[in-house]
């Protein structure tokens, strides 16, 4: 599959692993946890094992969230997670990491295309990420996990974002690092671009039907 570049009139971005370097942040935390146990795996680096563990966890966790969504239990699960998050929240809000080249990419793209965020994150942390890097002015719409009745991999947030931008879904490009992003985009009728800056693998993204795959999100500037 290849992208139909002239068809693209708007670009929709996932956050974690696409704009935000969340995956390396999680891997770094797990690596610090694993380092004292390095005698268990002396021939392998803690960083490599941390990344593989998170990759192994990501697909099942997406499946569980999709099931909760389908059973109309996602709102209840979200309230529980919010309560736990508030109970454990540090006095200083966490600082986010951003994928290399993303700021320049977005500052260039938003003058040529309407842009939107389509994330499975909660609204508070999504907006905090955008504000930390002064990216909010780049986006005409922000869809989070609670914006629509169903979240990714259902098409609802992609369709919602397209409506907010005033662009038909088939003229949108959904950019993300997991099969959940690709499935959501395809089911909405949008073109899809998989990026390898997160934990989705090239083979997974191709099987899901991504129209194009790039090593990094910043590489999109070379395509459009």
Labelled PLM ranges:
Residues 1-11, 107, 123, 127-224:
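Asp-based, Mg2+/Mn2+-dependent phosphohydrolase catalytic module
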Residues 3-103, 111:
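N-terminal helical cap/lid subdomain that shapes the substrate entry/recognition surface
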Residues 114-116, 191:
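Proline-centered loop/turn at the N-terminus of a beta-strand
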């Amino acid at each position: 599959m290849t992208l139909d570049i002239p068809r693209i009139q708007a670009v929709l971005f996932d956050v974690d692993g696409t704009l935000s370097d969340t995956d390396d942040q999680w891997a770094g935390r797990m690596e610090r946890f694993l380092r004292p146990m390095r005698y268990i795996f002396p021939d392998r680096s803690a960083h490599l094992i941390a990344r593989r563990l998170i990759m192994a966890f990501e697909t099942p966790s997406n499946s569980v969230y999709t099931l909760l969504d389908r059973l109309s239990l996602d709102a209840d699960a979200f309230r529980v997670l919010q309560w736990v998050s508030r109970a454990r929240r540090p006095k200083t809000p966490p600082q986010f990491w951003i994928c290399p080249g993303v700021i320049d990419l977005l500052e260039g793209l938003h003058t040529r295309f309407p842009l939107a965020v389509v994330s499975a994150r909660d609204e508070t942390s999504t907006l905090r990420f955008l504000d930390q890097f002064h990216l909010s002015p780049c986006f005409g719409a922000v869809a989070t996990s609670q914006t629509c009745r169903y979240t990714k991999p259902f098409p609802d947030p992609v369709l919602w974002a397209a409506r907010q931008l005033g662009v038909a879904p088939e003229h949108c490009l959904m950019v993300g690092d997991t099969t959940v992003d690709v499935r959501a985009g395809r089911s909405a009728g949008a073109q899809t671009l998989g990026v390898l800056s997160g934990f989705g693998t090239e083979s997974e993204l191709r099987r899901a039907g991504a129209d194009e795959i790039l090593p990094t999100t910043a590489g999109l500037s070379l395509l459009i």
